[in-house]
């Protein structure tokens, strides 16, 4: 008996490997805690929030550090300017404090 297509005319398909190579499973659970935090964030926020993006970045960094993912620059993984966004949000929260200080210093300057 013969198995397969009639006449052996199966088309030859070539598979290309993924662009970044394989993505091995985390058998030892080295990055599971970060992955669970990320999945919970996505479940709760239901959007691509900055907080969830930072967890995704942390997860990929964990995989790189443990050898489960090839080392690469975060910019190549789609994390463009995230550090700036974080520092901008921090500086904008500090702006309220700075504005009160700058207005008091303006008053001192105006009084002199």
Swiss-Prot record:
Reported function: Required for the assembly of mitochondrial cytochrome c oxidase.
Domain CHCH: residue ranges: 28-70
Segments of skewed composition (Basic and acidic residues): 73-83
Protein name: Cytochrome c oxidase assembly protein cox19, mitochondrial
Residue range covered by the transit peptide: 1-16
Organism superkingdom: Eukaryota
UniProt entry tagged with the keyword Cytoplasm: yes
Motif (Cx9C motif 2): 52-62
Cysteines joined through disulfide linkages: 31-62, 41-52
Mitochondrion among keywords: yes
Keywords for this protein: Cytoplasm, Disulfide bond, Mitochondrion, Transit peptide
GO molecular function: copper ion binding
GO cellular component annotations of the record: mitochondrial intermembrane space
Bias (Low complexity) ranges: 84-112
Similarity section: Belongs to the COX19 family.
Gene Ontology BP annotations: mitochondrial cytochrome c oxidase assembly
PANTHER family: CYTOCHROME C OXIDASE ASSEMBLY PROTEIN COX19
Motif Cx9C motif 1 positions after renumbering to this chain: 31-41
Xref: InterPro entries: CHCH (IPR010625), COX19 (IPR051383)
């Amino acid at each position: 008996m013969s198995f397969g297509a009639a006449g052996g005319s199966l088309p030859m398909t070539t598979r290309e490997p993924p662009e970044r190579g394989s993505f091995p499973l985390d058998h030892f659970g080295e990055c599971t805690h970060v992955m669970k935090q990320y999945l919970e964030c996505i479940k709760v926020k239901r959007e691509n929030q900055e907080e969830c993006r930072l967890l995704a970045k942390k997860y990929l960094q964990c995989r790189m550090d443990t050898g489960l993912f090839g080392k690469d620059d975060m910019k190549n993984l789609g994390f463009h300017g995230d550090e700036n966004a974080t520092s901008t949000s921090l500086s904008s929260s500090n702006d309220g404090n700075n504005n009160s200080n700058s207005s008091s210093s303006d008053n001192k300057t105006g009084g002199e």
